[in-house]
Amino acid sequence: MKKFAAVLGLTVAFAAASQAHAVTLTFACDSVGQGFDECKKGADAWAKKTGNTVKLVQVPKESDARLALYQQQLGAKASDVDVYMIDVVWPGLIGQHLMDLSKSIPAAEVKAHFPAIVQNNTVGGKLIAMPWFTDAGVLYYRTDLLKKYGYNAPPKTWNELATMAQKIQAGERKSNPKFVGYVFQGKNYEGLTCDALEWISSFGGGSIVDPSGKITVNNPKAVQALQAIQGLIGTAAPAAVTTYGEEEARNVWQAGNSAFMRNWPYAYAAGQKEGSPIAGKIGVAALPAGPGGKPAATLGGWQLAVNAYSKNPKEAADLVRYLTGAQEQKRRAVQASYNPTIATLYKDKDVLKAVPFFGSLYDVFTNAVARPATVTGSKYNQVSDAFSSAVYSVLTKKSAPGPALKTLEGQLARIKGRGW
């Protein structure tokens, strides 16, 4: 009895000691689609495993607003948030305020991730963020409607998309006045930068700024690309698409009110959920190409980083290690169709069963087109704002593509000044 009491006493003492050392971390995570719920599942699993607590904070939906908030917090050296979810184009903008994770996460685990993303997240020789999920724009289509209207495959070119979208739209509107052919991200924000870069690149018009730092956006093929997309609005795409972000587009699509959608892979799992009117009717393909061009998908994706001013850096780094590890990335891939950043998971049977297009579109994900964040450095945000605003003026028909890109070229030259 005395022995049992002694053991019980030690157990209680150990539990009390563990509780005394437990910390509460604050995690600025996702607000898009099922993103917040998936963040909570992962954070709760780590909390249960370690005895710590994770408090999730709601953040702005649009990445531009999120970045502005984070820059304000980090610029003030605030310790309110321990772990940040950051966009793939932010390391150069806020890296100086983030902790070097190379001393907290074993090198072998870091090497399991796509090298290009690890390199992207390395600033001044410091690993300031761990890859969490990668992204590339894809084309969603309704398999049942393509069959209904006599199509055997999704569109390979933007002209084909326009023709197919208009035909299906005309037919479906006889019974559903809300039906539209195509939805995408047409609102003036970072999402439009992603979509427009795909359009221009797929027409052979290059990027906004090339890797050498030269401003290249004002060229005939870029003009042609914007003319083509401008022509979709009011014909194959609704005028309201210029107010759509990712979720607005997904809501139209998931309600069964569009034939095609450009979005990120996360929308697949949401559409396949039980009760969804389009479950079992979703196809995913590479985005269309322009004449003589190749399909292009903008590289997206998010990372996890630790605030350099966190009061609990050890625990925060451990949370990042857990969430970006193979086990959690596999769970997120299977349950929510988030693209892993660990190459071996693209050969995992469970992952491929849940998200078949991870296998068929693997090359799309590994050859995605990067935004010019590295070459433009701290000026990237200004570059992106100017670019999306110019494109938005074209989509809303306030400017013609040629003059809009010529004006943009001048704006970018002023932003560049003597150099990036």
UniProtKB/Swiss-Prot annotation:
Name of the protein in question: Probable ABC transporter-binding protein DR_1438
Keyword Nucleus assigned: no
Function in brief: Probably part of a binding-protein-dependent transport system.
Keyword terms, alphabetized: Signal, Transport
Keyword Signal: yes
PANTHER family, per database record: ABC TRANSPORTER PERIPLASMIC-BINDING PROTEIN YCJN-RELATED, ARABINOSE-BINDING PROTEIN-RELATED
Highest taxon, organism lineage: Bacteria
InterPro entries, alphabetized: Bact_solute-bd_prot1, SBP
Family to which the UniProt record says this protein belongs: Belongs to the bacterial solute-binding protein 1 family.
Species, as recorded: Deinococcus radiodurans (strain ATCC 13939 / DSM 20539 / JCM 16871 / CCUG 27074 / LMG 4051 / NBRC 15346 / NCIMB 9279 / VKM B-1422 / R1)
Signal peptide segment: 1-24
